[in-house]
């Protein structure tokens, strides 16, 4: 995203709204997705791109139940039509044209029926997180969350009752165009209580259907707390700061605002598995040719 395009778009928005403000980069990172069976739309949700660093491939990250069309716990079909999706439409920002979107349609299954998506190598289908596709055209604006740089993960301290935001599309609603809605709630536990076998934590947030697959971030302006070795320090800053925490996957039940978030460490594992799968297929393709 060029600074010139961003600056001109900001001037346009401020002129139209009469409000002097800015468009947060995190608003640009959440992507509206729609799941289809052939031409029939079944559902909508949220996704985002993730990459290890600025030099690595980026993959689309969303919930497994979004692409399977099935309840993670019961395996029941989620659509009232009794169908499961076989393709997904992703609304990307157009490259070089902020405020315009480009739809990319991807199949979910190979010709042999094997899913295109990659699951967690440790937990498999138990983890409600998948990665899809590593190659994107030059016509889409790629704005990933980075797993292994301080751009999106800088050891900010986030404790119980601290605010966190779920940035997605509740009921398919957007704030404008295909820009997402920020739903903000609170951490409902300590992050250090997660494990490799159960890398899920709870938040207390009024998130709803359509926000499944949303990035969950601790966004701070004016100041933040940071883990520095074995200490927690307070930092005052005029610039906004955030910590990417994981991916939202829905409420624990319909009567509660407690929601599950799969920790960023799961996304790291899946990204590495997706990269390995991509390289293996590239090598096999070269050998066959």
Where do the protein language model's features map onto the residues?
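Cysteine-nucleophile amide-bond enzymes
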Residues: 5-10, 53, 107, 117-123, ...
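Residue-level recognition of beta-strand microenvironments
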Residues: 50-52, 190, 219, 250
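N-terminal targeting leaders that route proteins to membranes or the secretory/organellar pathways
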Residues: 1-20
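C-terminal subregion of chymotrypsin/trypsin-like serine protease catalytic domains
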Residues: 7-11, 23-26, 218-289
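A conserved glycine-rich beta-strand in the N-terminal activation segment of trypsin-fold
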Residues: 40-59, 258
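Structural detector for hydrophobic anchor residues on beta-strands
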Residues: 43-45, 60, 183, 244-245
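Serine endopeptidase catalytic core focused on the charge-relay Asp
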Residues: 28-31, 43-44, 76-198, 204-205, ...
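Short beta->alpha transition motifs characteristic of CBS
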Residues: 63-66, 168, 246-252
